[in-house]
Amino acid sequence: MYQNLAIMIIMLPLASSVINGLFLKVIDTKLAQIIATGFLSLSALFSLVIFCDAGLDGNIIHIKLLPWIEVGNFKVNWSIYIDQLTSIMFIAVTWVSSVVHIYSLGYMAEDKGIIRFLSFLSLFTFFMLMLVSADNFLQLFFGWEGVGVCSYLLIGFWYSKESANKAAIKAFITNRASDFAFILGIITIIVYCGSANYKDVFSSAELLSNTKIFLQFSILDVICLLLFIGCMGKSAQIGLHVWLPDAMEGPTPVSALIHAATMVTAGVFLVARCSYLFEYSPLVLQFITIIGGVTCLFAASIAIMQSDIKKIIAYSTCSQLGYMFMACGVSAYNSGIFHLVTHAFFKALLFLSAGSIIHAVHEQDIFKMGDLRNKMPVTYGNSLIGSLALIGIYPLAGFYSKDSILEAAYSSGSFMFIFGIAAAILTAIYSMKIIMLVFYGKTKLEKDVFEHAHEPAKIMNTPLILLVAGSFFSGMIGYYLLSMDKPNGYFHESLFNLHIYKLLISHPPLYIKLLPMAVGIMGIVIGICVYNSSTIMSFRPSSMSFPRKRESSKPFNLVYNILHNKYYFDEIYNFLIVKPINCLASLFYLGDQKIIDRFGPNGFSRVVNCFSVLTGKTQTGYVFNYALYIVSFIVVVISVFVWKG
């Protein structure tokens, strides 16, 4: 029974996508909505059953569906592998996806492309489920690339908008750059292990770590580094994060799905799944810790200066992913996945609440909003719960999972603990920035827009109850019932930790355990003080019409410009990569047009045309001309024979 349910969990979203996609022109909109939401809801319910068997009871479900690749001794089967890690990912992916599908029925109700949209959402979910249930690297890569293609389709869903098309292309190309490293990593694995199956590769980890290729670097270090670069692109870590804010051009439900439980978490999942490899590569683990710690602070600092509500939450996602990678870097994979699961619920709640606000006021700039708490009390409550969970306030989910990460970072002696604490303060500040500017103060909306602002339809608000429940209880369940914060807890059979005893014997002092929430409360107070004044320190250009404090000092302006322009990453990449490539492309274009085409196909065609024109002029229609041609030909022939002989 469990095997059949496991197959249905993955195939139901695919069936939904295929039915709605193939019969796009003929299927009734209501029927398409029922199929999409019904199939995804069934998938979510079945994932609960699988969680009870594979997750709670620890039974591994391994189904070999069919042979896929067979070349000599190299064999890969198309399989489904479900253990404790996969089962918890099933819960996060299917439940958040189901809520997003239902929410979309209201949000996209007036959009003519809603059936196409639902088809893309379902396909996205299928590829993510395929990714997390793979038992080999090639099948994982299939799901990995699948979510990349679907993100391109969803970000650019409104293809008539030039900005949406550019954002989709940017996301696609950025991920292709990182995926190139990922492909090289998989190829290296196959070359050195002779297999792509997890079991075979993981059993070779220690041997690979002893195979030195340059100084102290082993082939395993190279493999792990290449795999992690792939993760950096997919999970928007510093340097490869530039696609993330632009991805907000897609419909808001897309943002909730991509940035909560699916595509961006794939990188964290991969590092956790490959813990058997990474544990034997301490150099790469240190690199992961640094990248994660720097990203969580870097992205949080950018979020402070943003004014677009969706971009603030997007950079928040980037920051929280940094926390997850920091946990993996200090070998606390369990804490990283724990935060991944809790984050899926409260981040989806924040995105969909933002969608309700945008749907009501048709505006994304939080500095143009205000005083909406009485107009939209349910949305206000949802946003507040999501924000407090993100900050890590007891007893909400983020309190348990984020604290687990910071405690592990402290116990490992990593300096990134300081970065994590600093990011926690900034997280509280930008979360309060949204709450105070959107729901409090004097509204800056036009009078008729403000008067007509209201709660969205029940079909949009009702499913958010599940996310509210997840934001409240997922942390408690994970901490008290499943012991996800402990390396020998829920994930002890799925994740590998070479030095598990170090984490087990470490007991951070009480003040370290309380510090994250303390700095979170401090950040809340700062946020309220800064954004609740009649003279808001808005950190906006001086051209804005609403009040701001007197001109700041040059150092402040410098910091403001750096953060407001997102550390100039886009400008740097444009100068170093985009412009040189465009110049090279122009050079090749000129070479193609002026040289190859001119003297090649176009030149040859011009010669033929010229010859045909000259030949055509000989066809005068006069008999005496033709007689002249014949006589001339005879004279030439006779002359040749005479000359030769």
Curated annotation (Swiss-Prot):
It catalyses: a quinone + NADH + 5 H(+)(in) = a quinol + NAD(+) + 4 H(+)(out). The keyword Ribosomal protein does not apply. Its EC number is 7.1.1.-. InterPro entries: NADHpl_OxRdtase_5_subgr (IPR018393), ND/Mrp_TM (IPR001750), NU5C-like (IPR003945), Proton_antipo_N (IPR001516). GO terms for cellular component: plasma membrane. Keywords: Cell membrane, Membrane, NAD, Quinone, Translocase, Transmembrane, Transmembrane helix. It is found in: Cell membrane. GO terms for biological process: ATP synthesis coupled electron transport; electron transport coupled proton transport. It comes from the Bacteria. It is a multi-pass membrane protein. It is an enzyme of class 7 (translocase). It holds the Pfam family Proton_antipo_M. Its main location: membrane. The chain crosses the membrane at residues 7-27, 31-51, 88-108, 114-134, 137-157, 177-197, 213-233, 252-272, 284-304, 312-332, 337-357, 380-400, 415-435, 464-484, 510-530, 623-643. GO terms for molecular function: NADH dehydrogenase (ubiquinone) activity; quinone binding. Gene3D superfamilies: 1.20.5.2700. Disulfide bonds: none annotated. Belongs to the complex I subunit 5 family. NCBIfam families: NDH_I_L, PRK06590.1. NDH-1 shuttles electrons from NADH, via FMN and iron-sulfur (Fe-S) centers, to quinones in the respiratory chain. Couples the redox reaction to proton translocation (for every two electrons transferred, four hydrogen ions are translocated across the cytoplasmic membrane), and thus conserves the redox energy in a proton gradient. This is NADH-quinone oxidoreductase subunit L. It comes from Rickettsia felis (strain ATCC VR-1525 / URRWXCal2) (Rickettsia azadi).
